[in-house]
Each structure stands twice: as C-alpha cells, then as structure tokens.
C-alpha cells in the first residue's frame, strides 16, 4: 500500500472524509497526539486499526465526535457528571467512559458495555468529522507498544504501507493522550491520566475523583482493561528504560556507576552537562506541561541515537505530571529504582 502524507487543505480533508466513509483508515493530528481513525460503527474498518498497529483486540478504542448531538446512538445514557465535565472541558483532551449505545461496533469497545468518547479541539479532526459525518474510533498512530507520535514524520515511520493517508497538521500541542475518566458509579474514576487533571475535575464536579490503581501499577492477572493502555506495555523505545527515584546527586552517581556503551540519561532541563553519559532532557523539573509535550518525541529521539539503556529522572505523580509518570513507568515496564 502506498501511504500519502498530505498538508491540510480542503482537498486533503475531503479525501480523508471519503476514505473514512469507504471504511479505510486515515492518520491525522489531534491536540494530544496523532491518531489512526476509522468509522466507529464499522467493525471491519475498526479491525484494520488493530492490524495496522499490531494491537490486541481486547484493548478498547476511543470514539471521537465534533458535537454533543453525535452522542445519540454512541452512548445509551449521558450521566449528569458527563454533562458538567463536557461543559467545562469539551472540546479538549478529556475522554469520558459512558454506557455504550447501539451504533458503536463491539470491536471498537473490545466487547465492553461501555465506550470512551472524546470531543477533540484540534481543527483538523473537527473538519474531518464534519466532512465525513463519521464518528471515528482513533487510537494513537504508532505501532503497538512504541511511543505515540506527535508529528506526521514519526507517524509515517510507523505507518508507512499500513494505511493510505496521513494528514500533516504540524506538532501536537499537548503531547500525551487524553485523560480518561469513567463517569458512572458511586464516584468518577480516572482510568488514564492526561492534560485534564484530577484536581480540575473535582473543582467542576464538587466531589472526589478517584484514581484507578492500574494507572501507577500493573493490572492484576485476569483483570479487564477498562481503558486504552491499561493492559500492555506501551510507549517504549527500543532501549531498556529504568526510572531512578531520588535526588539529582544520587541519580548522577548511580549513572556513573552504570555507565557504558549505549547508556543515556533522560533528565530535566539544565542537567545534561552535569552527567557522565550522553543526556537528553524531557522538560523542566516539576513542569508537567513541558514534560508531557516533550516526552514521546524525546523517547523516539533516543531510538534514533541508538540508545541501548536509558536511566530516566522520575517526574512527580500529581497534576499533569501524573500523566507523564504513567507513560514513563510503562515505557520502563515498571522498572523503578530508589537511589
């Protein structure tokens, strides 16, 4: 298959809409990361996403819409909490898990009776949804397990020959996938952290928002994944990543004792020159927004530089930094060392 990479204009948006209507795949930019879109109602089209990514089909996908009216048929009920959160954060990087409606393919939801829905703010996604009339399922546009792409070039590296079209809309602003929150049950619960934080949602809802244990630790054997990325290793570069938890001095000393061929440091701004091995920063210490924006791009850069072993500085685990820690701990296959 020949994969075209086209700049965003009326013609390329019309082509993307036509392909989606025909049951084909399109990769396109969102404000979070680049995604692979297919008609969420068309099970055969959605299966192509799993094939293109090499992704297990028990990993649910998120449905993307461009207006509240599109929820009809996608969900069977819009809880009051969802209406409040939508008013505050849609369009934007928030996915809400609600009872599944009759129009969504079972393949999209991995057989669950719930579905995650998001209204993205990126103008390209909105334009394609409007032009096609299709609510689409769209995970990140990477091969399964690799870091999510935040630009068209990295998307092409993974998806060349796997789908017909990539729309080049420049760099994604946020850099990590959306927050996923389940809005049914006694309390809302974060299933995947992102740019919209626990604290922000609590301020809107006036109630506690719980955090699922699988955000910062592995799922237990036999436990069902309720959200994307809960079950499998994700976001990983080719190198073995280990997170080092402790002071900068302890981090530097640990790396000095483990230096060798192919060893790299993944650190914070301003620390690179103080380390005994090649180093690359993923943002300002304590600044979850900058860390989130840079993380996946930097993990892919480590691949390009031939890193074999990466020792990463540990981010915080609250606010937007919770999303960074969640991605990094999975890239490290939960290898964390106290130093």
Predicted regions and their residues:
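Active-site-adjacent structural elements in enzyme catalytic cores
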Residues: 1-339
């Amino acid at each position: 298959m020949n994969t075209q990479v086209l700049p965003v204009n009326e013609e390329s948006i019309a082509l993307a809409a036509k392909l989606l209507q025909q049951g084909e795949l399109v990769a396109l930019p969102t404000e979070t990361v680049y995604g692979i879109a297919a008609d969420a109602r068309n099970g055969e089209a959605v299966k192509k996403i799993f094939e293109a990514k090499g992704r297990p089909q028990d990993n649910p996908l998120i449905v993307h819409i461009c207006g509240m009216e599109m929820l009809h048929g996608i969900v069977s009920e819009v809880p009051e909490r969802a209406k409040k959160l939508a008013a505050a954060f849609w369009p934007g990087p928030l996915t809400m898990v609600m009872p599944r409606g009759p129009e969504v393919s079972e393949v999209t939801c991995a057989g669950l009776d719930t579905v995650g829905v998001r209204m993205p703010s990126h103008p390209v996604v909105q334009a394609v949804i409007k032009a096609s009339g299709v609510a689409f399922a769209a995970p990140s546009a990477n091969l399964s397990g690799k870091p999510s792409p935040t630009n068209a070039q990295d998307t092409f590296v993974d998806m060349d020959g796997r789908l017909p079209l990539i729309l080049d809309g420049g760099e994604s602003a946020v850099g990590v996938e959306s927050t996923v929150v389940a809005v049914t049950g006694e309390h809302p619960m974060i299933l995947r952290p992102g740019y919209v934080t626990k604290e922000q949602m609590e301020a809107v809802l006036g109630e506690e928002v719980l955090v699922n244990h699988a955000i910062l630790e592995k799922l237990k054997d036999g436990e069902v994944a309720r959200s994307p990325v809960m079950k499998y290793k994700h976001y990983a570069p080719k190198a073995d990543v280990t997170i080092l938890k402790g002071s900068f001095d302890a981090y530097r000393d640990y790396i000095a004792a483990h230096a060798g061929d192919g060893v790299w440091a993944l650190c914070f701004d301003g620390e690179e020159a103080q380390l005994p091995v090649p180093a690359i920063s993923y943002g300002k210490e304590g600044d979850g927004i900058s860390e989130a924006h840079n993380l996946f791009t930097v993990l892919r850069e480590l691949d390009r530089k031939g890193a074999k072993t990466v020792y990463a500085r540990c981010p915080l685990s609250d606010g937007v930094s919770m999303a960074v820690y969640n991605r990094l701990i999975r890239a490290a296959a939960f290898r964390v060392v106290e130093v």
